[in-house]
């Protein structure tokens, strides 16, 4: 204050003002400060001062040929005097205006391609709708969000290689483009940017925006996908929010969303199979999302969600070190604990074995709709500060924290028996048993917890057992806060291990994730998810199982038919026929299977009864363990569309319809593919007689040497294989029979098999 008063007094004297405005600045320190180094010390001032001059710009001498000395208004555009210290010309700002209006034009075709992300953003904003502004307290929590809509998911290194290859193809330096996405993008961009005149550095910068995910740790209340984040400054302030619907979606958000849907479906399906881990890996490797292999997306995409992280762990990728319980992400912020098994009694006198965490610990809990800070000691909740969007969300967080605290009053609040099971009908572990129990009904838990009077603390209020707010009393240790708790900001990833039952543990053996933590929410994916694994056929119901099973047989008919004739047992045990069994009425499975297998054996034995369409139609029924009975069927029942529908053993039906003219198969009216061969068997050729005593195995196999003529076959030993040239120059693989007794049927089946092998 003293200094300011002193300055005011000085300024009131006219002499002071004169000194400050009129005298030259010749103090060495000041001159040094403003002239040393290349860095401009006061850019704004410099700009104003420069632009006040007549010719603030310097340009190359060639400009004198390209721009007139005066414009239409007669104003001078450049000065004949050289710029001091260089051979450049001094130019007026008016010259820029002249150039922009009358200068040479260039092709603009590359601009939308290079500045694609900007053009797309403008489109999204143009078509977006802004709703009303609401004034209310904003509970924002910092989350790691994607700030760059419309990007691919390349790593920085991968993107760098692509950019170098596209923008500076002749530069030296090893560039390895390995991933499919790298190659596709490089090819596409090279074509798009042919003869592009935009500065290479600018192109490189813009390409980086398109290829790499950029994330920031920002305070958000509401949507976290990148199309919302790009308008964050327009949609939420400290005390207001504006409703907004984006005017378009971007692929990266769709990939994130679809990845979560696919991962959840896969984890749920794997849980119920005999070997969950093997099944999960098989499904991840055979699934595509929007035409890209799921495993490639998992390697590149940083989305953190329980199911996604389980898939990543299975692939041996690192994941975040936080753990999940009750749908909340827990991160320990201080303290430590040791684990010890302890037996406890529920209110129903059921014994539970729980792993007790002994020691003082603090955690942040972050969920989709609520966040909290939890301080706990051994089997005791010390303090829980919750914030959430609504009463329901806050209650969810409180239940999870109370169960996690392992307090005795929580365990004693259990009424009835705990016998929750997972999808595979296995009992859940005790902690999840308790969680499920109270998620169904927490009344007793809240009533038994106890309440306490509270102090008036800014921004905090109490919450009563019926979940209503109060300023006087609150559940013991629990407070509701206006402020959210930030998500864990670190992006560090740790090495984890996963067991057969998909439980993910860190190096110290703490369970971070398990299938119980995977949300049951059924979302609809934005991008097409193609599950090639037969394990996922049932995801869209019985009809899809039926169609997929027949499509699979037709797609693999080449190998299927050879197995059908040589090794039917291997064929019947294929996992692709498993989902189909759930469609066949339980009581009939064994009888149908026995019937079909007998029928197939007759086809193998008797001339002219081989019928491709019939084999395809009945094959899935033969996969069940057969019952030996003399039962004959004219139709087989499958349960689809809520009732039993019939497949006719001979002839077409609405379920299975083969059109001879088009050679296409429709299953329940859906196209299931085309048969590439002619199912009508013709007359036996001469080869069948000659090939007596040989078994036709299928197409030519180069490992067995060059093709022999039919006459040379007599030299083969029993069980020996060879390629043979038959008929119209076709080559098939045969094996000399080990037993003579079966020679009779050879000539009958040979024709059919030759036909099959050639086709």
UniProtKB/Swiss-Prot annotation:
Subunit details: Influenza RNA polymerase is composed of three subunits: PB1, PB2 and PA. Interacts (via N-terminus) with PB1 (via C-terminus). Interacts with nucleoprotein NP (via N-terminus).
Sequence motif: Nuclear localization signal, positions: 736-739
Assigned protein family: Belongs to the influenza viruses PB2 family.
Protein name as catalogued: Polymerase basic protein 2
Gene3D superfamilies in UniProt: Polymerase Basic Protein 2, C-terminal domain (3.30.30.90)
Location(s) in or outside the cell: Virion; Host nucleus
Claim: Ion transport is one of the keywords in the record: no
A GO CC term assigned to this protein in UniProt: host cell nucleus
GO-annotated biological processes: 7-methylguanosine mRNA capping; cap snatching; DNA-templated transcription; symbiont-mediated suppression of host gene expression; symbiont-mediated suppression of host mRNA transcription via inhibition of RNA polymerase II activity; viral RNA genome replication
Role this protein plays: Plays an essential role in transcription initiation and cap-stealing mechanism, in which cellular capped pre-mRNAs are used to generate primers for viral transcription. Recognizes and binds the 7-methylguanosine-containing cap of the target pre-RNA which is subsequently cleaved after 10-13 nucleotides by the viral protein PA. Plays a role in the initiation of the viral genome replication and modulates the activity of the ribonucleoprotein (RNP) complex.
Domain of life: Viruses
GO molecular function: RNA binding; RNA-directed RNA polymerase activity
Protein's organism: Influenza A virus (strain A/Duck/England/1/1956 H11N6)
UniProt site positions, description: Avian adaptation: 627
Alphabetical UniProt keywords: Cap snatching, Eukaryotic host gene expression shutoff by virus, Eukaryotic host transcription shutoff by virus, Host gene expression shutoff by virus, Host nucleus, Host-virus interaction, Inhibition of host RNA polymerase II by virus, mRNA capping, mRNA processing, Viral transcription, Virion
């Amino acid at each position: 204050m003293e200094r300011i008063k002193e300055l005011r007094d000085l300024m009131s004297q006219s002499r002071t003002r004169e000194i400050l405005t009129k005298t030259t600045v010749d103090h060495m320190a000041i001159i040094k400060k403003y002239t040393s180094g290349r860095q401009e010390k006061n850019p704004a001032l410099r700009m104003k001062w420069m632009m006040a001059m007549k010719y603030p710009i310097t340009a190359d001498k060639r400009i004198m040929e390209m721009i007139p000395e005066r414009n239409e208004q007669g104003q001078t555009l450049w000065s004949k005097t050289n710029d001091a210290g260089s051979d450049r010309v001094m130019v007026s700002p008016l010259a820029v205006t002249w150039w922009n209006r009358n200068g040479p034009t260039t092709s603009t075709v590359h601009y939308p391609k290079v500045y694609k992300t900007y053009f797309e953003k403008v489109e999204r904003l143009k078509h977006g709708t802004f709703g009303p502004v609401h004034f209310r307290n904003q509970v924002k929590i910092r989350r790691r969000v994607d700030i760059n809509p419309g990007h691919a998911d390349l790593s920085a290194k991968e993107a760098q290689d692509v950019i170098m290859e596209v923008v500076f193809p002749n530069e030296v330096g090893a560039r390895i483009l390995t991933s499919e996405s790298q190659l596709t993008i490089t090819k596409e961009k090279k074509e798009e940017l042919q003869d592009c005149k935009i500065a290479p550095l600018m192109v490189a910068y813009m390409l980086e925006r398109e290829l790499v995910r950029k994330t920031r740790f920002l305070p958000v209340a509401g949507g976290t996908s990148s199309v919302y984040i790009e308008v964050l400054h327009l949609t939420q302030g400290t005390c207001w929010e504006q409703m907004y619907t984006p005017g378009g979606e971007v692929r990266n958000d769709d990939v994130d969303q679809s990845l979560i849907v696919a991962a959840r479906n896969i984890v749920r399906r794997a849980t119920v199979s005999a070997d969950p881990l093997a099944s999960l890996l098989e499904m991840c490797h055979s699934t595509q999302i929007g035409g890209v292999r799921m495993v490639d997306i998992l390697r590149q995409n940083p989305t953190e969600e329980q199911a996604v992280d389980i898939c990543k762990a299975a692939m041996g990728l690192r994941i975040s070190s936080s753990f999940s319980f009750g749908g909340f992400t827990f991160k320990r912020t201080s303290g430590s604990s040791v684990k010890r098994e302890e037996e406890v009694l529920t209110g129903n006198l059921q014994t539970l074995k729980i792993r007790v965490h002994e020691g003082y610990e603090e955690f942040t809990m972050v969920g989709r709709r609520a966040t909290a800070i939890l301080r706990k000691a051994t089997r005791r909740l010390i303090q829980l500060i919750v914030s959430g969007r609504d009463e329901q969300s806050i209650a969810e967080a409180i239940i999870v924290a109370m169960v996690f605290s392992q307090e005795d009053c929580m365990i004693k609040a259990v009424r009835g028996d705990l016998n929750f099971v997972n999808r595979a009908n296995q009992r859940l572990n005790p902690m999840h048993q308790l969680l499920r129990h109270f998620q169904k009904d927490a009344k007793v838990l809240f009533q038994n917890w106890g309440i306490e009077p509270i102090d008036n603390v800014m921004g905090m209020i109490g919450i009563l057992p019926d979940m209503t707010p109060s300023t006087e009393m609150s559940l013991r240790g629990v407070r509701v806060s206006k402020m959210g708790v930030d998500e864990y900001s670190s992006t560090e990833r740790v090495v984890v291990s996963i067991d057969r039952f998909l439980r993910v543990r860190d190096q110290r053996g703490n369970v971070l994730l398990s299938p119980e933590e995977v949300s049951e929410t059924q979302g609809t994916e934005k991008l097409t998810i193609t599950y090639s694994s037969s394990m996922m056929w049932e995801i869209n119901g019985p009809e899809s199982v039926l169609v997929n099973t027949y499509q699979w047989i037709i797609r693999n008919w080449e190998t299927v038919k050879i197995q059908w004739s040589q090794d039917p047992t291997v064929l019947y045990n294929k996992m692709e026929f498993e989902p189909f069994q759930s469609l066949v009425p339980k009581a009939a499975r064994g009888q149908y299977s026995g019937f079909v297998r007998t029928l197939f054996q007759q086809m193998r034995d008797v001339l002219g009864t081989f019928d491709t369409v019939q084999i395809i139609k009945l094959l899935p029924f033969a996969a069940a363990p057969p019952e030996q009975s003399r039962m004959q069927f004219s139709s087989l029942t499958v349960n689809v569309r809520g009732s039993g529908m019939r497949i006719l053993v001979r002839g077409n039906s609405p379920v299975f319809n083969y059109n001879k003219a088009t050679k296409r198969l429709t299953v329940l009216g859906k196209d299931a593919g085309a048969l590439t061969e002619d199912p009508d068997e013709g007359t036996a050729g001469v080869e069948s007689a000659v090939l007596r005593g040989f078994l036709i195995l299928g197409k030519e196999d180069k490992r067995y040497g060059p093709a022999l003529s039919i006459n040379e076959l007599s030299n083969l030993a029993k069980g020996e294989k060879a390629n043979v040239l038959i008929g119209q120059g076709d080559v098939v693989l045969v094996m000399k029979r080990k037993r003579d007794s079966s020679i009779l049927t050879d000539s009958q089946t040979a024709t059919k098999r030759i036909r099959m092998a050639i086709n």
